[in-house]
């Protein structure tokens, strides 16, 4: 992606997802007003980033997809900064959570007031549940301000970095009900 001018693999992924939405909307059997996304881990934060960049996404499910940068692996942003994700986290911001130009609470707020389902396992060793809670708490006032104070649903299963079947089924039901 870098030879094509993208500053990160993440931005290239966002572009690919936006183009996928363009294609979906060109199909006669797709209702472009009822598009939802769902993703786990890398797919979980890709779902958030796509929704932040493209308002055609009406509902979002993110599973094990984010935490505050300070709570991500104890503040060690190495996992975020490798070449396949966002290398500028290392080269520009020195992998320092305090120097990051954004926080995931702001990504959630950018999605508001669209409906958001979060799977945040209690024992996720990558995306710390306390950091997830802090991001959600910071975004909720924006949801309330925009008229959807109950727009974020969070599930806290008793597991590690996983999207357990019962939470996945709850997400599918929620997507179906919310998009109707």
For the regions a language model picked out, list residue spans one by one.
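Alpha/beta-hydrolase-fold catalytic nucleophile elbow
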Residues: 38, 63-64, 119, 157
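Loop/turn elements at helix/coil->beta-strand transitions in domains of secreted/extracellular proteins
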Residues: 31-34, 55-59, 112-116, 150
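Acidic catalytic loop of the alpha/beta-hydrolase fold
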Residues: 123-133, 161-162
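Alpha/beta-hydrolase fold nucleophile elbow
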Residues: 29-41
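Cap/lid segment of the alpha/beta-hydrolase catalytic domain
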Residues: 1-26, 73-74
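The feature captures the conserved acid-bearing segment of alpha/beta-hydrolase catalytic domains
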Residues: 73-128
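C-terminal catalytic histidine-bearing segment of alpha/beta-hydrolase fold enzymes
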Residues: 136-180
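Hydrolase active-site cap/lid region
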Residues: 46-89
């Amino acid at each position: 992606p870098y030879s094509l001018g993208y500053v990160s693999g993440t931005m290239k992924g966002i572009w690919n997802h936006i183009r996928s939405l363009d294609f979906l909307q060109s199909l006669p059997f797709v209702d472009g007003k009822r598009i939802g996304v769902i993703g786990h881990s890398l797919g979980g934060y890709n779902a958030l980033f796509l929704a932040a960049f493209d308002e055609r996404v009406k509902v979002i499910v993110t599973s094990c997809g984010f935490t505050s940068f300070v709570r991500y692996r104890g503040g060690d942003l190495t996992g975020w900064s490798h070449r396949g994700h966002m290398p500028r986290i290392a080269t520009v911001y020195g992998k320092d959570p305090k120097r990051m130009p954004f926080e995931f609470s702001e990504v959630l707020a950018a999605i508001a007031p669209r409906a958001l389902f979060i799977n945040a396992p209690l024992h996720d060793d990558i995306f710390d549940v306390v950091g997830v809670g802090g991001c959600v708490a910071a975004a909720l006032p924006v949801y309330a301000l925009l008229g959807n104070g109950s727009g974020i649903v969070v599930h806290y299963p008793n597991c590690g970095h996983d999207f357990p079947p019962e939470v996945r089924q709850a997400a599918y039901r929620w997507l179906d009900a919310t998009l109707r």
